[in-house]
Curated annotation (Swiss-Prot):
Gene3D superfamilies: 1.10.287.1480
GO CC terms of this entry: cytoplasm; small ribosomal subunit
Organism: Halorhodospira halophila (strain DSM 244 / SL1) (Ectothiorhodospira halophila (strain DSM 244 / SL1))
Binding partners and assembly: Part of the 30S ribosomal subunit. Contacts proteins S3 and S10.
Keyword Hydrolase: no
Region (Disordered): 1-20
One GO-annotated biological process of the protein: translation
Protein name from the UniProt record: Small ribosomal subunit protein uS14
Pfam families: Ribosomal_S14 (PF00253)
Classification via InterPro entries: Ribosomal_uS14, Ribosomal_uS14_bac/plastid
Function: Binds 16S rRNA, required for the assembly of 30S particles and may also be responsible for determining the conformation of the 16S rRNA at the A site.
GO-annotated molecular function: rRNA binding; structural constituent of ribosome
Length: 101
């Protein structure tokens, strides 16, 4: 089980990223646009720097929905490997069968 503080920190980052996503995309479009002037780009860069650092989607970490474990995460299921195995053994994931050969 992951520390609750780490799970909450990641939840806060996701919330901030969602809040500032539209503004961030607008500013990045101005910066990357070849039609915008140098002054516009500079102003957009300054405004982008004013956005909180934790609002960047890169700072988010994929975590297991049940345990909060950051490693061994399967995107398709949203679970860590050990929770995925436990759920598969209990038959909680439809269509998932363990292979044996």
């Amino acid at each position: 089980m992951a520390k609750n503080s780490m799970v909450e920190r990641d939840r806060k980052r996701r919330k901030l990223a969602q809040k500032y996503s539209a503004k961030r995309e607008r500013l990045k479009a101005i910066i990357e646009s070849p039609e915008s002037s140098v002054e516009e780009r500079f102003e957009a860069q300054l405004k982008l720097q004013q956005i909180p650092r934790n609002a960047s989607p890169v700072r988010q970490r994929n975590r297991c929905a049940k345990s909060g474990r950051p490693r061994g995460y399967y995107r398709k299921f949203g679970l860590a490997r050990n929770e995925l195995r436990r759920a598969a053994m209990n038959g909680e994931i439809p269509g998932l069968t363990l292979s044996s050969w």
